Amino acid sequence: MNELLSKVNRLIRRTAQSLAACEASLQKLNAEKEKLAEKERLYDMQLRYLQSLLDMKELLGEVVFRQDIFYSLRKVAVIQQQIAEINLEKQKIAERRKILNKEIVQQQAQRKHWWLKGEKYDRLKKRIKKQLLNQMLYQDELEQEEKYNGRSQEN
């Protein structure tokens, strides 16, 4: 029985280690997800800024020189290129976030698995301890009965 108890204790330690590894992995994934969200917020701010620059570059019925038109067109092209690059980066972030969400779901399932195993082993340990206690009490009762019967026969 004690050997079984030591095996169960080993299993409990192993499940606790696996559970801790899952927790660490989840924390790492959530931290990465937070960084992605922060990057996306920064890109959104940049997009708003670039869009406002683009809006300011519109020629609204103004009389301008040809060189000013070309200068404005170059500026607009640069701004549009920057907007396209930021949108591409945002797409990459969205794809990475999808992957992270899948990994998080997998890790949560793994964590639940190890937590349930740990609970099962804890219940088993309690049951074994209870059986050991009952066995010891029964053994003690038998010894007491033998002592009592031994004294009775001597008298």
Segments predicted by a language model, with ranges:
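Charge-rich amphipathic alpha-helical interaction elements
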Residues: 1-155
